[in-house]
Amino acid sequence: MNAKELEKLLDCCFIAKKIIETLPALPKGIKPRHIHVLHVIYKLEVHQEECCVSDISRTLNITLPSVTKLVKELEERELIKKLSKTQDKRTILLKLTDKGEAYVKKYVLEFHGKWADNLADISTEQLEQTIQTITRLQETMPGLEN
């Protein structure tokens, strides 16, 4: 890859970031990051796994203080609830409320399902190549701690 090709790739990444930041229209006071956190909790709950702040931090690659702030905001909006782990009361588990689960279904599952239908012509091979390219871009980014 030469510098001009890299520039085109980075332009596409910028466009992709804008797509993620603007879709879909969310309720007042809800940010895309809130939906990402709700989705992580949902995915863990579906697999009957427990979810802690550290799980969200690791999955979304964001700092613990950032996750703590998002969790507080979601709890204030009654989208999640905190529970103490039975064996260790110091460990706080996160659970979706019915309202939180409804948000995931509407703003993630249904939305992604409809969007995926519109992208049915993209092959698994094309998708895997795109994922590999973006992953490689992240891994080789100068100044990024891996």
Model-identified regions with their sequence ranges:
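Short, hydrophobic-biased segments on the C-terminal half of alpha helices
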Residues: 53, 71-72
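The alpha-helix within a helix-turn-helix
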Residues: 57
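N-terminal leader segment of winged-helix/HTH proteins
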Residues: 1-32, 39
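Key DNA-contact positions within bacterial/archaeal DNA-binding proteins
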Residues: 35, 65
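Pre-recognition alpha-helix immediately N-terminal to the DNA-recognition helix
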Residues: 36-42, 102
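Charged, amphipathic alpha-helical coiled-coil/dimerization segments
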Residues: 72-129
